[in-house]
């Protein structure tokens, strides 16, 4: 009698073994149905069969499901669990600690081949990730050896070992690292400074802020790990060490950059500081070398911005955060790392069509990215996304560096910067035309006209920086050669030569990248001194405040004037408040936290007690707008924080560029320089006239002379003489008290301006200025 087969009604991912009853033998044997053709019954879904086979982890029914709305169709693979994209990266079990990896020696055939670790085999959904980079040249071992606790012959994890996986993964971090401090936070992750318990070195660990909530976040994390592992070490690329997953949260261990990011460095600059041109060229060289290394391995970074550029302890720039990186196919790669173009990007079409990810993937990722440094081809034609897209992001980054203004995220200004009109926002004379021209060439809207990395590296100023670096290393080599010659010739002076060798070895360690340190160290020293001064002022201010509070508790205390402390982000000077309730609520804080907007130049004996704040009009783009006969009220770009706004009037205290740098070439602002000189002369005349009138038109010979006698102030701080005008909130005179209209006793605050010297000024008064002069509050 022929055996009967029980054919399942649902197609399975892996072939099953069907048991056959044999009448001749009491035993049973199994046959494979991998070659069986599917029947119409297999297209139907049987719930009983699904629930029965669901218990077996190696047999997953193929039940297609519609994709999520937020998930591109190209990413949906209903047959694979979510953990598949990250669990197939390593063969290490979650019970293996990081110290086992760090303590490995050369193992010959046991070395891990990470090039083949990104397989397509699906693993259990409870598996975790633990990857180490064997390309790390900093380790003397050269390669890692698989610990004996790992089964090298098994491609799948043991499901029993994952029952307590969360505790094992937590101990992986706690047993090997001590958290020192938190370095910063981003849109997707937090970065911590840690100290290894194994080797005592400091590292940076990036922890995802949220658990993986779908395909997009998981693939983005896997993409960053793949990009970091596939890149060999480079001086200008952040070094990757290892990564692991804990409770659906990714952890990445990298090298630590003590000086923070470039964004932190720019934010720490004071208003009287301006970056030297030589330092900017030095930064540009580091970024271009790092991007050239990334492009040489057919990879696009696509997220170049100051937040992702880190300053090492040696003063050079390192590129990090490969979360947006994409891989180009190896076919038709004829660029040889030339920045994406041959003969001004003539081979652009062959590279643009070799993206390993489709257009939906790139567009979806950049919805979560930063649009301030985004190239225009992402919106016009995503097929043009290629290596010059990274060059555009570099141009916007250095455009922000030389202007000191924050880049817009969208709107007309965003389009204007991508329409070859960035020259309108550059300040003439601040930096050389050569630097401006390179930045403008990197920001070309036409991708075929955009400058390449090879052309940037051939710039004479870049070549000069490279020559200075090369000369420094040659000097170090000459010192070493001289020491060897001294050791061979002076055999009788062994003690002296040993001392010379020790001194020179110390000098060699200190002189490595000393050129970078010489450029950036003055800024760090100035920042440290400024922080010490701020801390000292805070301590002194706290002591004065304590004394002030003690006097306020006594009835005989004399009312002390408010301390003026100007803060960025406060309300503008045109916001006038006169409500009685607001006066009562904000009486203690309004005088300290906001500047007084009128001049008390005639207070001869009380000028030291009252702070006078003055505004500097040279900190923004208003000077450029005045040259173009535009209104200074419509600033083209939103200004940065108070510390980022650069002042052009304090060039004496800045570090000027070296005289041997090229400042010749095509003058970009030849006509504008003449106009700027005329406008500066007019501005100086206007400032002299305004100084005679004081702030808001309070003349030096006006009614402010009545304030000389401080004895007229009563205990509440008001004038005892009723004939003298009272000072309202923000130091404005209360002209009158109007009764009527239902709101009895409502105060009207106004500012008295003097138009005697400039009668024609009232004709040019704009509505915005009128609102700043007169405002009524109920």
UniProtKB/Swiss-Prot annotation:
Annotated Protein kinase domain residues:
177-462
Binding, ATP: 183-191, 206
Sequence ranges of Basic and acidic residues compositional bias: 757-766
User: Could you identify this protein by its name?
Assistant: Probable protein kinase DDB_G0291133
According to its UniProt record, this protein's enzyme class is transferase
SUPFAM superfamilies assigned: Protein kinase-like (PK-like) (SSF56112)
| Residue ranges, compositional bias (Low complexity) | 599-651, 671-693
